[in-house]
Amino acid sequence: QIPKAKYEALSTKLKAQNPMMKLLSIQVGRPQLVMRNGEPVSTSIYKQPIESRVMLRTLNLDGDRQADLRVHGGPTKAVYVYPSEHYAFWRKEFPEMDLPYGMFGENFTVSGFSETTLNIGDEFRVGSAIVMVTEPRMPCYKLGIRFGRTDIIKRFLVSERSGFYLAVLKEGEVGAGDEFLLIKRNEPSVTVND
């Protein structure tokens, strides 16, 4: 915990850069088989929105599972977060596609966050949980399956709109509409995009 005065100053600074840090939508999914080049592939990238509050656990949200634990999930990748602001960019890139929240396989679609202003190690309270920013997303070929196009992975990387992963420091209940409250700013540090 940081002293209240310092917390308020840091929170004010971060909010000035990111005015309203809010959880807009929660998506969960379980492994399912899809075809890729004539072969079955297990993936959990097809996330569905949930309306109710849900428990955020050390390894994932209740109702969410990762398909390949060698590269997805674990304590440092419990939740994948994607800023809603990026959807406007992708809708211009792919005007013919329907791009609902969760299209990138994210668990949390958020507003007011940017990979350029968040530091690795920043900690937030959301709902009754405490989470920490851990790393940017490096997409695998399953993003190409979801989009039905192989060029999305390169375009995703070049766009610098990666989203980021969270570790869960304290389990708790979360729901759409919850605000992210900064409780620890990791400075000096590197941003998610560094």
Please give the residue ranges for each predicted region.
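Loop/turn positions that initiate beta-strands
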Residues: G121, A176-G177
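Short beta-strand-turn/beta-hairpin segments enriched in glycine/proline and small hydrophobics
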Residues: R146-V158
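Short beta-strand His + acidic residue motifs that chelate non-heme Fe in jelly-roll/DSBH
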Residues: V133, L166-A167
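Conserved SET/PR domain catalytic loop and adjacent active-site segment
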Residues: E171-A176, L182-K184, S189-V190
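Arg/Gly-rich low-complexity intrinsically disordered repeat tracts
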Residues: Q1-P19
